[in-house]
Amino acid sequence: MPPLFAEFDWFNLGQQTINGLQFGALVALIALGYTMVYGIVELINFAHGDLFMLGCFLALTVCGWFGLADATVADAPLWKLAVTVGLAVVLVPLFCAALNVGVDRMVYKTLRTAPKLAPLVSAIGVSFVFMNVGLFWGGSQSVDFPKVLEASEAHVLGDPPPSAATAGDPTEQKKTRNLLGPNSKLEITSRHLLVFGVTVPLMIALTLFVKRTTTGRAMRAVAQNPAAARLMGINTDRVIAITFAIGGALAGFGSVVYTLTINSVNYQMGFQNGLYAFTAAVLGGIGNIPGAVLGGLVIGLVRSLGSAYIGETWSGALIFVVLIVILVFRPTGLLGSRVREKV
């Protein structure tokens, strides 16, 4: 029987909502980098999704340095898990930030005054280059990321390990990791908390940075009028480089969170997740930081609820139906504002 005609279950609705918000927050984390760059230089950086993918492969490589694999991570000591995650949290954002700035300096900087189609096509080209680097780095098949978070939950949360009778039962193992207790019909794990615990503070910090710091005010000046900003003594190239660095770092944080929660990496993942992130940025109002988060949450809910009640086949199409409907009534997105351009 199709999911649409299944008996309605309020607990299932709640669980799908929780899962949708988790995925939406993850999409929002990637979308923040998209909207940050577009808000300053009006460039749709289609390579952003594949930059996120390379960050995932670097996180996988960091696990390899410490000998962590899917088969051995359960026996790893807590200190090794903590050091691995800590090193990934530092190295991956730095790597993505440096790579993003390098691409800007080598590719986008020379196209600042070119027609807008030129940097757009160049971004698509960079995306294909990154995708092939990912293919060379990790191969053509999906690679399982070590379940570092699950292995550490027994230590951090104090949950009892599954008994021998239930050790092979994934359902029973999941129940032991539920923060609401093993008998709760709703499941909230540390994966859910991790995604929100990273996305929401980063959104708040980014908003405060743009609105209240000197560099943030310089970014807004460059976004409004680059020529006038230069006349006021603002180093626009430096501001744009900082913007790309922040956007890349956000992609890197998204990479770490994604690998810890999804546990699967492949070279094509950047395109799909990048498309979701771009859609979230447009849906919320591209260039608007809270809008990117709101757009990501909407996409996560539509995807999760659509998969549960309509069918996974149609969930992707439903996301873009929602996007079209919202843009028909609000062309600037949910939180976007109308801006008049003088000629």
Predicted segment positions?
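Membrane-interfacial amphipathic/re-entrant helices at transmembrane-helix boundaries
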Residues: 1-30, 58, 69-86, 114-118, ...
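Cytosolic-side transmembrane-helix boundaries in multi-pass membrane proteins
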Residues: 2, 11-12, 224-231, 235-238, ...
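Alpha-helical transmembrane segments within multi-pass membrane transporters and channels
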Residues: 71-126, 133, 294-299, 330-331
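Inter-helical junctions in multi-pass inner-membrane proteins, predominant
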Residues: 8-26, 209-214, 240-287, 304-317
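Transmembrane helix-bundle core of multi-pass membrane transporters
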Residues: 3, 111, 119-211, 305, ...
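Helix-loop-helix "hairpin" substructures at the membrane interface of multi-pass membrane proteins
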Residues: 187-265, 289-294
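Membrane-embedded helix boundary and interhelical linker motif in transport proteins
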Residues: 5, 40-102, 106, 165-172, ...
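Single transmembrane alpha-helix segments in multi-pass membrane proteins
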Residues: 13-64, 102-118, 281-289
